[in-house]
């Protein structure tokens, strides 16, 4: 009996001891430090968030950054779905939108600074032939894909937008949709859009920074999945950025658990 206990303890203790030894000898060096501003605008998601216009949300960001020297900051980070006016902005026309132009005008004063933020986007389809499996039927001959996305500006390659791809079941994703929708039909539309399925993307994306590093735009629930986060690193990410809507959790342990996951992933 004692032999079995001793063997079990050794099996557990030896890897821990090796890990601690490696940790003590490991030094993390960087020749190019990144200066980051992480914003928490503290917008109540239950009473304010979705009634606030995008231009007002941008003004809050600018006001929060006003006391700081933007020329010394490499990256400004805003929360998940921070720009969430209405149903979102059209993905097809995003770069010609008023919000995009306003962000571009703001950052043109700070050529060394990049801005990454959460945003709601959508894409419409008017034909059975072009609609996707994730698109939501809004009315006759109109289907819409909704995205919980991350956006970086300015960007220096084709990767400017990433769509959240690990969705919260029941909030962003309807399970067994092919079975449930024919049964409930338009009842789904009467729930305020809360059960609209979000669209995703197949591969992880990293956003390159001016200083040569690359960030993983991890959105909320995605951080729970270790191997999923690893895919960001395989895509070239060297910095993990986790954007969340922690205010949804109110005064619970949820936001603290999110922080613990973030430290674990790092």
Give the location of each predicted region.
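Membrane-interface segments at or immediately adjacent to transmembrane helices
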Residues: 11-112
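Solvent-exposed soluble domains appended to multi-pass membrane proteins
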Residues: 78-266
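Membrane-interfacial entry segments at the cytosolic side of transmembrane helices
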Residues: 2-10
């Amino acid at each position: 009996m004692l032999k079995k206990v001793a063997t079990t303890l050794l099996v557990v203790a030896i890897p821990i001891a090796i890990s601690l030894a490696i940790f003590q000898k490991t030094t993390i060096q960087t020749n190019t430090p990144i200066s980051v501003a992480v914003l928490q605008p503290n917008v109540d998601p239950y009473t304010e968030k979705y009634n606030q216009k995008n231009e007002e949300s941008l003004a809050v960001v600018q006001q929060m950054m006003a006391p700081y020297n933007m020329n010394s900051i490499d990256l400004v980070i805003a929360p998940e779905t921070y720009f969430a006016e209405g149903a979102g902005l059209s993905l097809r026309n995003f770069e010609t939108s008023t919000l995009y132009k306003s962000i571009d005008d703001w950052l043109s004063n700070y050529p060394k600074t990049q801005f990454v933020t959460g945003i709601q986007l959508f894409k419409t389809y008017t034909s059975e032939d072009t609609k996707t499996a994730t698109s939501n039927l809004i009315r006759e001959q109109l289907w819409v894909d909704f995205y919980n996305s991350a956006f970086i500006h300015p960007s220096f390659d084709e990767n400017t937008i990433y769509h959240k791809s690990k969705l919260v079941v029941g909030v962003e994703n309807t399970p067994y949709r092919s079975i449930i929708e024919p049964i409930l039909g338009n009842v789904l539309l009467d729930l305020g859009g809360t059960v609209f399925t979000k669209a995703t993307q197949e591969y992880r994306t990293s956003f390159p920074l001016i200083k040569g590093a690359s960030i993983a735009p991890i959105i909320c629930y995605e951080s729970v999945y270790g191997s999923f986060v690893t895919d960001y690193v395989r895509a070239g990410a060297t910095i993990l950025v986790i954007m969340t809507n922690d205010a949804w959790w109110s005064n619970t342990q949820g936001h603290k658990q999110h922080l613990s996951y973030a430290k674990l992933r790092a």
